[in-house]
Amino acid sequence: MREVYLDYSATTPVKKEVLDEMLPYYMDGFGNPSSLYEKGEESKAALDKARDRVAKLINSNPSEVFFTSCGSEADNWALFGVADALKEKGNHIITTAIEHHAILHTGEFLEKHGYEMTYLPVLPDGSVDPAVF
């Protein structure tokens, strides 16, 4: 029987081109890029090169490109970052009730720290009903 994988929101297969590009770092180039020894400096150079490539691809400045360890960490950064950057404009954040736990838990944390969270209900197809407003 042919396998059908349906959990792409959790993880996805790695494209061969990506694996080929990453394999040297999995095998030998795994130094801590914050370290001062040679293997760390090599890792930092590779990380900087990757950052430059991504920045060029999305037409941004390399200083605006951040790498995270996972989607949950990226979600946390995004929500905390927006909340902090815009706190002078208000403390009300609106999201949906079906967000990933990384967003929902961050929202709960922000509520405990003075933010007002609104969790919009969604329709069976996942869309938001404008009548709720």
Task: Label each region the model flagged.
Residues 1-133:
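Pyridoxal 5′-phosphate
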